[in-house]
């Protein structure tokens, strides 16, 4: 496996040929706000793996020899990640010793032991480097990765020369489930990759909005428009907040948002993003836009009601005609066809594009998004209990909610009352709980925007609800809200492992901690339920389902971790639980001594090694009075 990793890195390096710096960033411990999503994905992944094993056993297929590879091991603090870091260090030493191309650039390795998500560690480096003497504002940046948020991260830098590199992903049946083709991974060629020039996207945004320049009572500024664009995109979904209930890309929500923005901007008195260019926003101006979106909620929901009823009728006709759907079935709890009436009339390619964009906006990985776009539609009503142990409510819009939009129904107010009661346990007349929901979502928008522009605002903050408020309720008094964050400290690796892993992956933790995930009498037992409930109502794809896991009690979790004596851990385990440094590599023509190979069967040692590795601790909180990104 490591040899293949090395070969793939070789190919990417030779395509891009960095002349100044190569920054290799691996995910370290994430902010608490991200752990909710990580926890949901890992729990679902574990249940799906169990389901596949059960299906294979039912078919009489032999079990694979040895323990199956648990992809959840790709989490900070595991033995796998520790080995990966050591192998990558040797790999860089080897390349700078032997390969002239690698000798020209400085290499920084930020491994799993360095806190922060990989792409945000790269942004952190750029943010700090911009303030250093000798920074070249015309240098070119190339960011490689598959994550959905890289475009937004590239935009917020306001760097003029920024491009994104990723593999070509195939659409359609038999296309490796949205993954890069096997040929690309096994025998990579330049034709297997795509390069997005973010500067070109900036030009398109400028062309889109420059037409309103004459109508503005303040100077038109493309950089501020870019910041506003990023903020508006946050409203339809990100890795840290659920999307607003009536904003769905597949229904044209982004187009509606941008049209509303174009119409209202001349009346707002300025841009929605903050004047400091530091990831803030003017809540009163955003309130005006959300009020307009709130006025459209009744129509959006009424359209959904009609589409759901029509789709249910089509399903019934097909069933009575003896024809079923191919692909993913109802028993898998997966959501099928749908969207607005207009969506059913667009071409297949447009429909796939909308599905993929919806996936990206709602926080799915890029590969998940493409898989969703390629997948066939599934039946409307899944079973209440699936074979994988995942419970599913009716998809699309339930019959009870559809009745709200029939003649004599409760309309939007009735729908809201049912939504808040069923999804959030709130009564619409209870002002304090609704204020708490609004405040939490406002804090979430503030946290996410600061995260993109300035880095982590708080390591411990998270959104404590599974659902978002309605746009009209979020807008109510938004302009008077404020957000203040406590920076806090990152989780330690074993704390994050315990926070995000399902019981099926308990072996990834040192033995003294495993009972906390598996024992019925564990103080944390309530946070590791036997049955995983997923709400698919209103969702078109399985990955969109809302995983209804209880939110972990951080203080209780840390108490449980602290209750295990350090003497019960080996030296290697203790080392894996500590934060570590960045490693900076530079070519050393005169040599620095011999280095043993970490993979002696595949690669010889370096005699001598001609690369110098120096350790450096990552920077702390970015100064609040220092200019970061922004127009």
Each language-model region and where it sits:
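Noncatalytic, typically N-terminal accessory segments of nucleic acid-processing enzymes
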Residues: 1-631
